Structures are given as structure tokens and as C-alpha cells.
Amino acid sequence: MRISFDIDDTLVCDASVPTEREISRWRRWRYPERLRRGTRSLMAALVRRRCKIWIYTSSDRSTHYLKSWFGSCGIQIEGVINRTVHERKVGLRGPSKYPPAFGIDLHVDDSPGVAMEGVDHRFEVLVVAPDDPDWAVRILDEVDARIRANPYWHARFAPRPAPGIEQFLPGLTQALRWMAVTP
């Protein structure tokens, strides 16, 4: 499942919204924007569910900047859609965001206007407000519901049990039993 996130007022909010813990001075100088608290753990939980994380922003932040910024926070970004990429693929007359053009299954944004465009152009948008303290839980609940509802995703993304050692070494169990009874 591909999930895209808006940046402004979704992952980066104003000073009244709690942010992730302090980062090094070098990173603060290079990446002055602070991620909303819970972003790292949310992204880690999505990766554990085998989701691909994308950034979809109407700003002109470069792909390199966004990938290196999130990478410095321990978050691997699969792809970036900025204004230039969006306009090249969707055009100037289309909606402000159009995730299906990039194979994205769910877009997370703070704007009700993007949600209305989603209804008009038939793409899925989850709106999270900057002041919502349970925003990450809402996103995970939505992703889990979508995974359960889609048999393909359910089979593909469901957690798999760790393989037993017997699968790797078929004769190991029998050899261990033989060694235990042999003096």
C-alpha cells in the first residue's frame, strides 16, 4: 500500500503543536523544520505493515532535500511529488493533488479542500487536523481497516510469523533428538 503525506500543517505544523525530540545542531541548521510529534513512530509502524511512504507537497522543496531530511530522521521515503512533478504529470488545470497518477492508495492531508477534490476525482484522502493529538492512531486505524478490507492487501501485508529453525534445517530436530539419547 502506498501512502502519501502532505508536509505543511500535516507533518510540519506551527509552534503550538508538539514536535519530535531535539535533533543535532547540524541537522537543525540544514533542516530547520521540525516534524510533528509521533511522525517517526507512525512511519515505523507503517513500514512494519509493509506500506510505502511517499511525500506529496504543493511546495517546491526538492526531492533530494526531502529524502535526505526524512532520512536523517530515520524515515525512508519511497517517493516525492512536489509541485514541479505534479504539474508535469497532472497539468495546471487538474486538482491541486492527484495521488492516483502516482499509484498512491491513500493520501493524508490537513486540508478539507483536498478531501473534496478526492470525492470529485475519486481518490482516497484522510484529513488530520494539526491540533488532533490522536492523529497517528487515526492514520494507523484507517490503514489497518483498508488492509483488512482488501483480500490482496490482507494476504500481502498481514504480519507473518517468524520462520522456525526446522524450516531452515530440516534434519536438525531429528539430529538433536539422536544426540540427546546417545551417551
Regions found by a protein language model. Name each.
Residues R49, R61-P183:
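C-terminal cap/substrate-recognition subdomain and adjoining C-terminal extension
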Residues E33, T57, D105-L106:
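Residue-level marker of alpha-helix boundaries and capping positions
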Residues S24-W54:
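Short, acidic loop-to-helix structural element flanking the phosphoryl-transfer center
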Residues M1-S16:
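Asp-based phosphoryl-transfer active-site loop
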Residues V12-W26:
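Short, basic/glycine-rich phosphate-binding loops at helix/coil junctions
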Residues D6, W54-Y56, V108:
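Short hydrophobic segments within beta-strands
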Residues M1-I3, I53, D105:
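Generic beta-sheet signal
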Residues T10, T57-T63:
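Short, catalytically relevant binding-site loops at active-site mouths
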